[in-house]
């Protein structure tokens, strides 16, 4: 898990998803086919849960806004292709346009967004999510 101070996590609204919860979230998917995106990836716990469930790293994509969290995400998930990871604001249209581009326009979303921005982030994802 990240070595961020409690104050830093609070300022980011960041509380990383425990493995047990991540695994439960993954089990709720009807299908594990296709690509998966976590727009608020943190340390990548949801991506690792998908991988544990059999989803190949080549079908996993991530975005993380905070630079130190982004760098830690890359370190903690060495099998995640680097060109599948963005360091952008999930509330920015450009983040979603870039994700559509790198995924080929097809993906399912898994995320546990910062509580303080959850509604805005989910609304933005729905605006750009492929049908």
Predicted regions and their residues:
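Class I S-adenosyl-L-methionine-dependent methyltransferase catalytic core
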Residues: 1-131
């Amino acid at each position: 898990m990240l070595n961020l101070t409690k104050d830093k996590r609070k300022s980011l609204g960041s509380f990383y998803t425990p493995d047990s919860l991540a695994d439960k979230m993954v089990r709720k998917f009807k299908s594990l086919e296709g690509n998966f995106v976590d727009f608020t990836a943190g340390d990548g716990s949801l991506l690792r849960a998908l991988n544990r469930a059999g989803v190949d790293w080549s079908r996993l994509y991530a975005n993380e806004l905070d630079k130190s969290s982004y760098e830690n995400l890359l370190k903690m998930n060495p099998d995640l292709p680097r060109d599948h990871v963005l360091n952008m604001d999930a509330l920015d249209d450009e983040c979603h346009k870039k994700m559509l581009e790198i995924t080929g326009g097809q993906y399912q979303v898994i995320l546990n967004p910062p509580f303080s921005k959850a509604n805005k982030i989910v609304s933005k994802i729905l605006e750009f999510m492929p049908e």
